[in-house]
Amino acid sequence: GLPGTLSCRLQPNHPTDDPDGIMASLLEGLTFGAGDAVLGLNPVDDSVESVRRVLDRFQEIKSRWDIPTQICVLAHVTTQMEAVRKGAPCDLIFQSIAGSQKGNEAFGLDGKLIEEARQLALREGNATGPNVMYFETGQGSELSSEAHHGADQVVMEARCYGFAKRFQPFLVNTVVGFIGPEYLYNSKQVIRAGLEDHFMGKLTGIPMGCDACYTN
């Protein structure tokens, strides 16, 4: 959170979502000073019970050491919403987004749902500030789902940021090379796309991040 300093997400993923295994990765990451932006897990189990269990453990660690960060489990937005309604602690609600209505429908969402999630987080979440949404994007996702309407992937990515800005996000990460990796030929194109996304995000006026991911 310091001026001129990059913040990062700590991502203590585990192949079975075992709470003890997650905590081992989480504590190791904290020793490196990682996680000042968010403690965020990609779950294997997208159930409400599993999401709530992980969030409870995250909150326990955060409270025990009074860590000034945010917690989030990157399940589908509807799963997170139900977990929050059932009392799960949560600072940020996550969702992958696209740059077209058809692309977002492929992700199982629309603007109304995202606003509903935002209002729920503001009302029942633990965040102290007004920025309670965490989005991930990435060039090529709309092309993968035939949802780009003939536009190139940079245009579609720029549209993601306009959509995201409406919801006053805490963080927008371009996960370049993850969704739609078949549309990035090699590492040079991944770097190019990451730089394009970073500058587009900054010009749009959103808190922009970049997730280094290369899956093709």
Which residues make up each language-model segment?
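N-terminal amphipathic alpha-helix/helix-capping segment at the start of soluble metabolic enzymes
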Residues: 1-9, 15
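A cross-domain feature marking catalytic cores of carbohydrate-active enzymes
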Residues: 10-12, 41, 69-75, 96-97, ...
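Glycine-rich, proline-tolerant flexible connector loops at the mouths of alpha/beta enzymes
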Residues: 37-55, 176-185
